[in-house]
From Swiss-Prot:
Name listed for the protein in its UniProt record: Uncharacterized protein PM0492
Native source organism of the sequence: Pasteurella multocida (strain Pm70)
Amino acid sequence: MYVYDIPNCNEFISMYGCDCEIEEFIQTCFFHNKDKTMKLNLSFDRTINSLRIIIYHGNKICFDLYKENLKSILLDENGNFISFFLECMQIELSIYPEFSVFIR
């Protein structure tokens, strides 16, 4: 397990095999499930330490979460999940074997 403030694109790509881009101050990682029927976009705004998770089924949004005050991120060394720590909650995002979000 590794703890980062906000990991850079290379760290996400090497641990999760996703695509990643940075535009202005927004870093976005793109994930797909095995059969490519679902995709997940994970975005960070470095200017306000915000997090946005959007899960699509086909072209339709089925989950959209935006939170500010991101404190730290825990990357699973096996590439199965990512944990986000905010001021008053923890969000665990499961990447593999399927997308799921747990909020504590």
